[in-house]
Swiss-Prot record:
Protein's name according to its UniProt entry: Non-selective voltage-gated ion channel VDAC1
Numbered residues of crosslink Glycyl lysine isopeptide (Lys-Gly) (interchain with G-Cter in ubiquitin): K12, K20, K53, K61, K109, K110, K161, K266, K274
Family: Belongs to the eukaryotic mitochondrial porin family.
Location (main, coarse): mitochondrion
Record bears the keyword Transcription regulation: no
Effect of K20R: PRKN-dependent polybiquitination is decreased, whereas PRKN-dependent monoubiquitination, mitochondrial calcium uptake and apoptosis are unaffected
Keyword terms: Acetylation, Apoptosis, ATP-binding, Cell membrane, Host-virus interaction, Ion transport, Isopeptide bond, Lipid transport, Lipid-binding, Membrane, Mitochondrion, Mitochondrion outer membrane, NAD, Nucleotide-binding, Phosphoprotein, Porin, Transmembrane, Transmembrane beta strand, Transport, Ubl conjugation
GO biological process terms on file: apoptotic process; behavioral fear response; calcium import into the mitochondrion; epithelial cell differentiation; learning; lipid transport; mitochondrial transmembrane transport; monoatomic anion transport
Gene assigned in the entry: VDAC1
Species the sequence originates in: Homo sapiens
Length: 283
């Protein structure tokens, strides 16, 4: 293991098996294009089949690789505008600096963040400062890795309250085909996940979570099967008897169709199930 993942990416492989390939209750359209000069456009729109609410977003990104710079502009249907400037591997190898700002003309709300990340062999360190009107908050994270073993700590300090408001700890083990992840959030929320790549076509995952003082344990299993290079099938179920099914088909290069359904196993004949449709275009 050269560089360990960020704290947010610990256990990501298992989460991807549970989340990717599903879009319950949504009709979604994604479009990604890239011009000859390297300018990337990403637009996304979705409609909620229950509330009929329509949301959308637009993002443009330009990479100035010669200087390690990335410029990103964002807009969404809540009329929030965002700007992000990133410089990587310029001031020091493995160091990434990001300035992220957003502004909502409707409400006048402004937000700014400075994000820093440093990664080298066996270590991944991050520190973000959020400049909020109520007072800046600082979020720090550290992940150490050695021979597949991972240990991470994440904290959030609010200057207005002069105290740590979040303290999370995680331990895991990672190989190319197997991943184990456990975490404790604020000493009250406990979770764990296992990811197993059975073979080139089949991936499986298990997750478990519970809260101190609550006897309700949340448990789920999921699997993803690559039928052929252009099609894959996903399925998951949890201890609430909710069954998720997903099918993704590449219709032609750059066009991908996703169909998904969420079924209530306790009330199969009662209705209330959710369906999802997604189309992704990439050029």
């Amino acid at each position: 293991m050269a560089v360990p993942p960020t704290y947010a990416d610990l256990g990501k492989s298992a989460r991807d098996v549970f989340t990717k390939g599903y879009g319950f209750g949504l009709i979604k359209l994604d479009l990604k294009t890239k011009s000859e000069n390297g300018l990337e456009f990403t637009s996304s729109g979705s409609a909620n089949t229950e509330t009929t609410k329509v949301t959308g977003s637009l993002e443009t990104k330009y990479r100035w690789t010669e200087y390690g710079l990335t410029f990103t502009e964002k807009w969404n249907t809540d009329n929030t505008l965002g700007t992000e400037i990133t410089v990587e591997d310029q001031l020091a190898r493995g160091l990434k600096l990001t300035f992220d700002s957003s502004f909502s003309p409707n409400t006048g709300k402004k937000n700014a963040k400075i994000k820093t990340g440093y990664k080298r062999e066996h270590i991944n360190l991050g520190c973000d400062m959020d400049f909020d009107i109520a007072g800046p908050s600082i979020r720090g994270a550290l992940v150490l890795g050695y021979e597949g073993w991972l240990a991470g700590y994440q904290m959030n300090f609010e200057t207005a309250k002069s105290r740590v408001t979040q303290s999370n700890f995680a331990v895991g083990y990672k190989t190319d085909e197997f991943q184990l992840h456990t975490n404790v959030n604020d000493g009250t929320e406990f979770g764990g996940s296992i990811y197993q790549k059975v073979n080139k076509k089949l991936e499986t995952a298990v997750n478990l979570a519970w809260t101190a003082g609550n006897s309700n344990t949340r448990f789920g299993i999921a699997a993803k099967y690559q039928i052929d290079p252009d099609a894959c099938f996903s399925a998951k179920v949890n201890n609430s008897s909710l069954i998720g099914l997903g099918y993704t088909q590449t219709l032609k290069p750059g066009i991908k169709l996703t169909l998904s359904a969420l079924l209530d196993g306790k009330n199969v004949n009662a209705g209330g199930h959710k369906l999802g449709l997604g189309l992704e275009f990439q050029a």
